[in-house]
Design a protein with these regions (language model features):
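Cytoplasmic helix-loop-helix junction between adjacent transmembrane helices
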Residues: 108-149
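Paired small-residue
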Residues: 92, 103-111, 309-317
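C-terminal transmembrane helical hairpin of 12-TM major facilitator-type secondary transporters
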Residues: 285-329
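Helix-to-loop junctions at the C-terminal end of transmembrane segments
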Residues: 65-77, 270-283, 367-368
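Conserved MFS/SLC helix-loop-helix module at the cytosolic interface between two early adjacent transmembrane helices
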Residues: 64-100
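Juxtamembrane intracellular "pre-TM" segments in multi-pass secondary transporters
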Residues: 2-10, 190-225
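Helix-breaking motifs and short loop linkers at transmembrane-helix boundaries and internal kinks
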Residues: 45, 77, 98-104, 115, ...
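Helix-loop-helix hairpin linking two adjacent transmembrane segments in secondary transporters
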Residues: 104, 133, 142-190
Length: 402
């Protein structure tokens, strides 16, 4: 698939490694308070239910800001925007650790959500600017390891470190990671010419509305965005309730549930480490189809499992299958509209968060009325069909571009 412009000189590896560090901290911030809520509630002398607003407000800020930031990255440069966002996030995350009351913690979490929401979409868009399309899925797959480790840190290590050192120090650790990434990003901006790729100075001037129109007029962009919304809503509308199902159906303790659910990240890391082999062997269509098939197999297993000891293998398979399908979507999102790449990836990322929000809400209603079994079976059917649909869409797209 042709690129819109020649790739600039410079060292892409060092630039992307620092983006991975910033993405690690950004992804960790999404999930870190899940395991810290009881400690925060006790320390601030409020209920866990009241404290949960720090999760809601963060996700609201993190997802909504992505709807409007795209043209800014296209205009001023994605790498520069990530550096500024990481610096702002470092300050806001440190303020989370210093907050003496729940209202101030909510305000700091809201601010950190607005800041970190810039990092991952622009990191993906920057990789789209500097890595040729034929190599992009492999690079994005390896880049994903930073996000996956961040998710694992947020879900598991956050609670462990909170027990050992206190919840405030967990935020200070993440603030230090963001500050370190900021210094590295600024250094790269100063010395590495590749960090200025995709800057608007090399593109014709357009307004914000024109950037969004460019993306939404593209039938391929609309296809990728719709599929990503469905994928996110169905995937997380079911996966969110895996732990609750294990506890209610089999009586699995919460500690074991946490360990079981953590195997999702291990499946993601397996994909990240094997992405080169998978791309070379199966191509995008094979990976998308295989990802959907693995997701279907795993969710059917969870629905029909006779013993909870089967769950870790099924959840690991969900992690592998999800990242196979999702990373193929991400790769195509970076090439939907190269002339407005930042805007395109920001819309794509926002669709993921909106889909996740809708899916979790709908899944909760179904879970309360009918248990998780119909959720898992529906997810299996839809995700299998989605993988096949996307693989067929990729084939048509490549035929049109040939």
């Amino acid at each position: 698939m042709p690129e819109s412009q020649a790739k600039p000189g410079g060292n892409a590896t060092s630039a992307i490694m620092l983006l991975a560090l910033a993405s690690f901290a950004a992804q960790a911030m999404v999930r870190v308070t899940d395991s810290l809520l009881p400690q925060i509630a006790a320390d601030l002398n409020v209920t866990v239910g009241a404290t949960s607003v720090i999760v809601t407000f963060y996700l609201l800020a993190h997802g909504s800001v992505q709807l409007v930031i795209g043209p800014i990255g296209d205009r001023f440069g994605k790498y520069l925007c990530v550096a500024i966002a990481a610096a702002s996030a470092a300050v806001m995350v440190a303020l989370c650790g210093l907050a003496p009351s729940l209202p101030l913690l909510v305000a700091a979490r809201l601010g950190s959500g607005f800041a970190t929401g810039w990092i991952i979409p622009f990191a993906f868009a920057f990789i789209g600017d500097v890595i040729p399309y034929e190599r992009r899925q492999q690079v994005l797959g390896r880049f994903l390891s930073g996000q996956i480790l961040g998710q694992l840190f947020g879900q598991a290590a956050g609670g462990v470190l909170g027990d050992w050192f206190g919840w405030r120090n967990v935020f200070f650790i993440l603030a230090a990671a963001l500050a370190t990434a900021t210094l590295g990003l600024i250094y790269e901006l100063w010395r590495n010419p590749i960090t200025h790729a995709g800057h608007a100075s090399a593109q014709p001037g357009r307004g914000f509305i024109a950037d969004y129109s460019t993306v939404l007029r593209s039938s391929w962009a609309r296809t990728v965005i719709v599929i990503s919304f469905i994928e996110s809503s169905v995937m997380f509308g079911a996966f969110t309730y895996v732990g609750a199902d294990l506890h209610l159906r089999f009586g699995v303790g919460f500690t074991l549930v946490g360990l079981f659910v953590g195997s999702f990240a291990i499946g993601g890391l397996i994909y990240s480490l094997s992405v080169r082999v998978l791309v070379n062997r199966f191509g995008q269509t094979g990976i998308a189809t295989g990802g959907g098939a693995l997701l279907a197999l795993a969710y059917v297993t969870l629905a029909c499992e006779p013993s909870y000891w089967i769950a870790p293998a099924a959840i690991l398979t969900i992690g592998l299958g999800f990242y196979m399908l999702h990373n193929t979507l991400q790769t195509n999102a970076t090439q939907m509209t190269p002339e407005a790449r930042g805007t395109a990836v920001a819309i794509f990322s926002s669709a993921l968060y909106l889909g996740q929000t809708a899916g979790v809400a709908a899944g909760g209603v179904i879970f309360d009325r009918f248990t998780a079994v119909p959720l898992f079976l529906a997810a299996a059917a839809v995700l299998l069909a989605l993988g096949l649909w996307f693989a067929r869409a990729i084939k048509r797209r490549h035929a049109q571009m040939a």
